């Protein structure tokens, strides 16, 4: 039987924080679990800037707002349209202006309620306004629960690249209520599965084996199975972040498996056309093809990865993949060193390595391998 609430610690010294995982504990105004954990995490607070996805304005965001108001906290509510196009300079500026007009100061706390877009945008607003405000994440999508809400990466997109402007800004707390997944559209839920599967490939072979057996139940949103997958994913993310918070040792870069290709797919397709998790799934396939071509692993790894991604109903190929458009975008990837592309590539299930000086013709071949037909 799953406990009513579970916790995972992100160990970063005096900036450590908890990830709370529950089901339905944001629902009750009579038992304000969120407000109590919020106050324990942030301490004294009389003003919250609640930045939320418009899609959850009348559900979990309104419940969070009600609990905080009942605790005597003044709320400034900012609704953000869904989609990657909201991660823009203009949207960030509009948030800053509302914060200024509402009397936001260094004692205020920013609370992000929504998916990865809202978390990234609100986190960067918190990091930059008055040189830094306390920040709390309330992720409402599978992808944001297992990935973007944990680790402190915040930022916005530029026309030429994803997440090109941002900062590391750790939250005071991450509050995951899996009940919010019950209303998440199937496409968005499945998109998040890519990041769950990623953890098995990069770091946890035992978890990957579990996913091979449980992918179908996850798609059905079986509560116990879902809670376990979220907890295991958060444990992996917390472990890697604790070892390399700001990507100085290279350890944290393993979390970018498939992402060099994925970000180029998103940018060339147009933000929002291909969901992030969908792009990551295709990017993982491209990375596996590249690893085979670089003789880092044999084809069985690709076959195992393909089987799990397929079971999760994730895309394996993108018919519009164009190396001529993708390579220039990839040249701006943050893992580029001395003008050379570097890739996170698997050598076996449960382990990846950073590989540099990859010939461009091999990158092109990997892209083309995932263009015309499923693997």
Curated annotation (Swiss-Prot):
Enzyme class label: lyase
Domain of life per record: Bacteria
Transmembrane segments: none
CDD domains registered for this protein in UniProt: DHQS
Functional pathway: Metabolic intermediate biosynthesis; chorismate biosynthesis; chorismate from D-erythrose 4-phosphate and phosphoenolpyruvate: step 2/7
Cofactor needs: NAD(+); Co(2+); Zn(2+)
Keywords: Amino-acid biosynthesis, Aromatic amino acid biosynthesis, Cobalt, Cytoplasm, Lyase, Metal-binding, NAD, Nucleotide-binding, Zinc
One MF annotation (Gene Ontology) recorded for this entry: 3-dehydroquinate synthase activity
InterPro entries per UniProt: Dehydroquinate_synthase, DHQ_synth_AroB, DHQ_synth_fam, DHQS/DOIS_N, DHQS_C
Subcellular localization, as worded in the UniProt entry: Cytoplasm
GO BP term, example: amino acid biosynthetic process
This protein's GO CC annotations: cytoplasm
Catalysed transformations (reactions): 7-phospho-2-dehydro-3-deoxy-D-arabino-heptonate = 3-dehydroquinate + phosphate
NCBIfam families named among the record's database cross-references: aroB
HAMAP family: DHQ_synthase
Free-text function comment from the UniProt entry: Catalyzes the conversion of 3-deoxy-D-arabino-heptulosonate 7-phosphate (DAHP) to dehydroquinate (DHQ).
Protein name: 3-dehydroquinate synthase
Gene that specifies this protein: aroB
């Amino acid at each position: 039987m799953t406990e009513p609430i579970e916790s995972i610690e992100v160990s970063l010294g005096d900036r450590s924080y908890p990830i709370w995982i529950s089901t339905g504990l944001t629902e009750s105004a009579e038992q304000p679990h969120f407000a109590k954990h919020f106050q324990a995490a942030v301490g004294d607070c009389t003003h919250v800037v609640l930045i939320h996805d418009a899609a959850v304005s009348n559900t979990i965001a309104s419940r969070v707002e009600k609990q905080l108001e009942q605790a005597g906290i003044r709320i400034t509510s900012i609704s953000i349209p869904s989609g990657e196009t909201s991660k823009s300079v203009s949207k960030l500026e509009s948030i800053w202006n509302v914060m200024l007009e509402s009397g936001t100061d260094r004692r205020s706390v920013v609370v992000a309620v929504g998916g990865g877009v809202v978390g990234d945008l609100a986190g960067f607003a918190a990091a930059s306004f008055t040189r830094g405000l306390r920040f709390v994440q309330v992720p409402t999508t599978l992808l944001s629960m297992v990935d973007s809400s944990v680790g402190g990466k915040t930022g916005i997109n530029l026309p030429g690249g994803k997440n090109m402007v941002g900062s590391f800004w750790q939250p005071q707390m991450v509050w995951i209520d899996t009940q919010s997944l019950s209303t998440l559209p199937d496409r968005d839920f499945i998109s998040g599965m890519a990041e769950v599967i990623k953890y098995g490939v990069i770091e946890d072979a035992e978890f990957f084996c579990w996913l091979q057996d449980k992918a179908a139940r996850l798609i059905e949103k079986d509560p116990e199975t879902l809670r376990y997958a979220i907890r295991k994913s958060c444990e992996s993310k917390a472990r890697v972040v604790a070892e390399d918070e700001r990507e100085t040792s290279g350890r944290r870069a393993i979390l970018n498996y498939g992402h060099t290709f994925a970000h180029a797919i998103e940018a060339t397709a147009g933000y929002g056309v291909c969901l992030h998790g969908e792009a990551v799934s295709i990017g993982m396939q491209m990375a596996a093809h590249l690893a085979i071509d670089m003789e880092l692993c044999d084809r069985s790894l690709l076959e195992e990865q393909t089987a799990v991604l397929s079971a999760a109903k994730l895309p394996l190929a993108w018919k519009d993949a164009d190396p001529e458009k993708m390579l220039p975008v990839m040249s701006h990837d943050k893992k580029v060193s001395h003008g050379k592309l570097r890739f996170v590539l698997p050598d076996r299930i449960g382990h990846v390595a950073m590989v540099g000086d990859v010939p461009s013709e091999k990158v092109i071949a990997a892209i083309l391998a995932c263009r015309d037909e499923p693997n």
